[in-house]
Each structure stands twice: as C-alpha cells, then as structure tokens.
C-alpha cells in the first residue's frame, strides 16, 4: 500500500492526498514534518513534505509524485490521453506553482502566523502575483476546470494555491486578486463542493493545533 508522509496543514501534501482520493486508491497517512535531522533526510533528501513511500522506495517533490501516481496507479484519470493536452496540464500546473504559489509563500509568515515580512519582499510578491494571476487568466480555460472540462492535476495545484495566494493578497498586500477573476472564484467554489475536499479540510482543521505548537516550539 502507498504511504503518504507529511501533515494535513501542508497544501502540497493535500494536493497529493486529493489525487489519491480522486483515484480511489488505498493509502496510509504517516505524520512527517520534514526537517534537517538525519532520520528526516533519509526519507526526504531536502527535508520537505510530502513524500510518497512506494514498494520501490521514497519519492519527493509534489509534481513528481503526482506524475508517478498517474503513471502507475489505476482509477480516475487526472491527465488527458493526448500528449499535447497532457503537456498543457503540466504547463498550467507549473505556472500556478512558480508564479502564484511560490510568490505568495514569501508572505505566509505575516499572513498566517503573525510574523513580519520585509516591505521589499512584499513589494516583490505583489508584482509577481499580479503577473502570475495575469498568466493564469491568459492560459487557463476554466471550462469549468483550469485545463478544460475535466478535473486534472492542474486543478489540484490551483485549489491549494490560489486560495492561499488570495488570502495573502487581502491580508498583507491590500489587494483582491480574484476581484476581476470570476472564473477562478467559481472554480474554487466548485472544488470546495468536492466531497473529498470536506475530508481534507476537516483533517487540516484537526491537525492545526499540533502544527501551531510545533511552529511555536521551533521543534520538528
């Protein structure tokens, strides 16, 4: 059985978790916060989450894990059959990660954990996020899903990145990135109605106290 190592507060962990649930695959969840301790680095070379444990060993990096699951496991397809359309899904996924998720992450400390972020970092995040959302508007199809009519891997990155980025915009940057992006708002609502999302969000809520205690203590 596949084992998913990580924790339910992590958006990247939840992307993989949603893929496994959508495909109807059995899997075991293993709490793992990563870090630089030797035992953590044996599981994840960079000490990051998530990690997928397979019969052949451990895999890190979310996009790699998602591709591995899609290539090796049965169940609902999360990539189209056509090679070009597959590439478009991966293109959208990578654009959302590079130009929305990662810039927003630079302000997570202030947005979600009550810490301060340097003004220059916030200025760069604002510019990068404006460009990132403009990119998504140009390239996303939203029919109603990011890449078209079917749920794909791009939607997993979308639903666990765009909501956080918009929260950063409102709380830290004084901007609503979705104010003129009704298609993205509609897709977030649609994804929120997915029954698997209810489980994921409940697990996230239940895990939050332990996660916050870990943050306060500085221990992993």
Swiss-Prot record:
Pfam families: GST_C, GST_N_3. It is an enzyme of class 2 (transferase). It is found in: Cytoplasm. Residues 82-211 form the GST C-terminal domain. Glutathione binds at residues 12, 49, 61-62. Its EC number is 2.5.1.18. Belongs to the GST superfamily. Conjugation of reduced glutathione to a wide number of exogenous and endogenous hydrophobic electrophiles. This is Glutathione S-transferase.
């Amino acid at each position: 059985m596949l084992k998913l190592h990580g924790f339910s507060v992590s958006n990247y962990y939840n992307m993989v978790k949603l893929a496994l649930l959508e495909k109807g695959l059995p899997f075991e969840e293993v709490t793992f916060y990563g870090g630089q301790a030797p035992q953590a680095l044996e599981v994840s070379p960079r000490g990051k989450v998530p990690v997928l444990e397979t019969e052949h060993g451990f895999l890190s990096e979310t996009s790699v894990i998602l591709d591995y699951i899609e290539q090796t496991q049965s169940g609902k397809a999360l990539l189209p059959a056509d090679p070009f359309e597959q590439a478009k899904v991966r293109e959208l996924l990578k654009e959302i990660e590079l130009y929305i998720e990662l810039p927003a992450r630079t302000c997570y400390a202030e947005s979600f954990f009550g810490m301060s972020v340097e003004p220059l970092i916030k200025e760069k995040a604002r510019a990068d996020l404006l460009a990132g959302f403009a990119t998504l508007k140009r390239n996303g199809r939203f029919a109603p899903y990011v890449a078209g009519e079917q749920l794909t891997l791009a939607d997993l990155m979308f639903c666990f990145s765009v909501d956080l980025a918009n929260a950063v915009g409102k709380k830290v940057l004084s901007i609503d990135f979705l104010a003129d992006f009704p298609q993205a708002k509609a897709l977030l609502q649609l994804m929120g109605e997915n029954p698997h999302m209810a489980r994921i969000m409940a697990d996230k809520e239940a895990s939050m106290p332990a996660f916050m205690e870990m943050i306060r203590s500085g221990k992993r």
